[in-house]
Amino acid sequence: MLRTVVAVLVALFAVQARAQMTGSATLLSDYRFRGASLSDDRPAAQLAFDYDWAASGLYAGGMMSSARLDSRHAVQALIYAGYAHRVRPDFSWETGLRYTRFSGHEAYAYAEAYAGFAFRQLVGRLYYAPSYFHAGYPAWYAELNDSHALSGKWYAFAHAGYLRRGGDVMEYHASRFRSDFRVGIGLDLAPYNVQLSWTTTRGASDAVFGYPSAAGTTRNAWVLSISYAW
Amino acid sequence: MRHTWVIATALCTLGLCVAIHAETQQPSQVLVMLRAAPPHLRAADDYAITYASSPDEAARKRIARELAHQYGLQLVDSWPMPALGVDCFVMRIVSGTSASDIAQALSHDTRVESAQPRQTFHTLAKDDPLYALQPTAKRWHIAELHALTTGKNVAIAEVDSGVDASQPDLDGQIAEQRNFVDDSGYRAELHGTEVAGIIVAREGNGVGIVGVAPQARLLALRACWQLADGSAASACDSFTLAKALQYALEKHVQIINLSLTGPNDRLLQRLLDAALAGHVTVVGAVDDTTADGGFPASYPGVLAVAGEHADVQRSDVWLAPAEDIPTTQPGARWNMVNGSSFAAAEVSGLVALLQELSPDLTLTQLHDALHARSALGFASMRPMTIDACAAVAQVSHRCTCDCGTTRASLGVPRR
């Protein structure tokens, strides 16, 4: 996997001559992915980079994050590439592919396609994974994100997501749906960004969706994060 | 009296000279536009930095610093222009190279979307207080028009120098004030306050004047600065004007009033294109000292307005009263003003009256309403004086002012 990541990084650096590159390093009190903790309710560190070829609308990027799966430490590698098109100054759409895998937990590797729109601060996306967390069944995820500038450098944000899996769920005696919500405030102290949010999930448990989270992780959490962008 | 005339003339001449000097000076800064990618998914989207307004801004700032270093420039300022999908960076020229040469070189750099010199503009007030009082409201029958429409809730962006919102005739009439000139506080100035009074001065308050559209929502966007105390002469530049236009677009105003002029400017042209594409009516004052009327009045789609006695040859120019206009000044003061700046302000107010009557009024319908036609129905080949009553009657389909006069203007036989 390391070779794949290095190859992708080399390729991106090779074509970055005319791209706009952004990087960020983030520390979080809990790594929540669609409401599920991928860090076993513990702190995590992330390193992300993004490339934009603004003239063409193409973009690509990746992230490495510490994780804790099945009660064991791991490193997540995530890469993505897509195309975005601005229709009007306040409206654009995008489509792309994203691929995720975890060191020492190759069985959880999966890919998903997505399409979405952005209208002013409102962002909506629909994701489709043929085999969500490599569990052998497809899953759809829809999300809406919004943010609102408050006074000075403060802002508020909110997220709502809805996950639906395919396949048989009889063995779990549970529904195939789950929703997650997140609300919070942020402080933009460029290049630093601090966020405090509260996240919760409703519906089926982590196990129904094949999440590699440890047993006993909570459904609700306060998450504090600080990121540095360059 | 003679003494006052001499002093006023001297002040006026001094003010205009300062403005003209500022405009003819070689630009010492360039504006460099870098493309901003449309919003899209990012690596940490679900986790930490989703909601930052523009996470890739740091990348463009880094490229701007690289460009400044490479071309021997000094990075001064920047401003996002989402209406054009770019960030605009201001760079000062520290070598002796001309701004146009550097802008041309930058334009060929693949990292750069476009580049241009930072140009200077000036307002079009003649600032002569010695003409006899002659209320212009009488010529447009403002009181009678207000029985039908007052421009209620129509948003007008006045891109100008600062407006005194505490002036008794403007108290409560200014929806928002923003300063795009510098980081200091908003400042009340002559030209901006004079133009604002003509558009929205409070009606029936027992003092001063009546604005053409007293119930319109005026956004007082300070993009110009007064050059000397006591003189309305003001200067602006490409960057301050672009910031104000960008803000007006963000606020979805219906009308933009530009009582100013200067050279053709690519960045401002693109912002005007965005405004016109969004069905915003842009009103520009004609500079009758230039053959084409000056920019932005000369730009296609802009309602170009000149004074009734101006010597203009273009047939697509509208004429409105521009002499002896009583209006507001900072503090509890009023004075008579002259210049196409104020004719443009009157037309902006009139457009607000029409847009209250017909919010979906297209630019073509607006032109038809304003454009007086000959008795045979042919469009005029000369600049024509606006008949406000006829325009309101055409849009409202109702009798207004003197019905006979209105019908005559519309080409309908008088009974």
Annotate each predicted stretch with a short phrase.
Chain A
Residues 120, 183-193, 198-200, 216-230:
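Outer-membrane beta-barrel "beta-signal"
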Residues 26-30, 63-67, 84, 98-102, ...:
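Outer-membrane beta-barrel pore domains and translocons
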Residues 110-173, 198:
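Detector for outer-membrane/organellar transmembrane beta-barrel domains
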Residues 25-29, 47-51, 81-83, 97, ...:
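Residues on the lipid-exposed face of transmembrane beta-strands in outer-membrane beta-barrel proteins
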Residues 19-68:
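Short glycine/proline- and aromatic-enriched beta-strand/turn motifs that initiate or cap beta-hairpins
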Residues 21-25, 58-62, 79, 93-95, ...:
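Transmembrane beta-strands of outer-membrane beta-barrel proteins
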Residues 41-45, 73-77, 91, 107-113, ...:
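Residues that define the transmembrane beta-barrel architecture of outer-membrane proteins
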Residues 54-56, 86-90, 119-122, 149-153, ...:
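Outer-membrane beta-barrel channels and translocator barrels
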